[in-house]
Amino acid sequence: MSGPSIDRTAARVGIERADTLYARILSEYGDDSVAQLGGAHLACEGVSNVLTKVLEWGRLMAYLEQSTRYVPYTDKPGGAWKYHVPADLTGSPLRDRFVRTLDTAFDTYARWIPAIEAHFRSKYLKSPDDSDGVYRSVIRAKALDTLRGLLPAATTSNVGLFGTGQAFEALLLRMFAQPLDEVRACAQQMLTELREVMPAFLARVDQPNRGGRWIDYFADTRRTFEAVARPFVAGVAAEPRGDVTLTGFDPDGELKVVASALYSTSALPDDQVLAIARGMSPDARAALLRAYAGDRANRRHKPGRAFERTSYRFDVLADYGAFRDLQRHRLLTLDWQPLGTQHGYVEPAAIEEAGALAEWRAVMEQSADLHERMLADGYRDSAPYAVVMAYRVRFYMEMNAREAMHVIELRTSPQGHPSYRRICQLMHRAIADVAGHRAIAATMQFVDHSHVELERLQSERHLEKKRSNF
């Protein structure tokens, strides 16, 4: 027997022994507790952006997704653009139209990258202090940021996941309950791969009386609720709103954060500390919050859990590209409506400046027409695949002040995409001006409200400096 064969046999024996041990421990200590102690890495390749949102739903997992900001989608493996065609279109005349429409979107995207780069090179001249590599990377990132709205939600990507056995079980149960063929097929592939390394943790996923009942519960509840809820909202026109609306906050929230900060340094009951906070002057409360936040040297220095005492709920209308970035903040409470075309689309100024406006709008129109046709023909679940990322989607984000500090400071940093920078700048202003929590907003000292022309410039300079030190 050769060396590699011996290694594989030894590995298999090791897994079988571990599986036997886990099975015994599971029976003695309980499934859920033990399933938190083992983890696995998994790579999902060639999955649509619709599917990535399902994969990235769980809070207690780690994800790494291929970026549309830095990686151009210009290669054609096997002669086809990288997007997913829904299986339920097989045999339908709409399939050919779907392919033609998405091919046009990708053709337009790829064809305009050189022209948009040339436009930005003429608008933003290279500094003598920057290397050719830094300048080239900055211009390329700016062009891809501008054009990513042409990419459809069907665009495929690669996602890396890490999670415990318990987290993967929860993810797979949700995926098997989904109506989309792509999601369920991916779940089956994931289950097969994961059983190579953690079979005991996933034993009940496809057992009819265990995971099967769970899956039926998810699927049946979704269908029943949609049928019950639809009459209440169907046909109701959306009232006009801004891109960011603070729909929920506690007028006494800032006062309660002060009380929570005092609580940890006292031996007093919660309600008594709150009464003390009410008796403080606004200046005294602001000074106490400044002391609690401390001398923050960078955005990673965050105050303690007292900031979790008050929360903010934002209703957001943003392009799907920006939503994809903000949705990754999964520890807060976030949900979204189906992606469609009824809310219109964003149109970067550089598109018109570079002469691409007519083709941009043609792609938008074709995407909307295909989406509407898919809805009319009964492909409601698959219709979002046809929508390009410039179209806007409505979602809400509800987070406590500590989470808001993290999200808003991170997503307004100069290297961020202009779309989500603007969204988070509006959130920060709403906390101060609408909620009136000016002292809390003031502790978010690394929120950047500046207008940045070349978003990646400082970041690329920093990266080059780091590389030169190795």
Language model regions located:
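A conserved ligand/cofactor-binding region detector
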Residues: 1-470
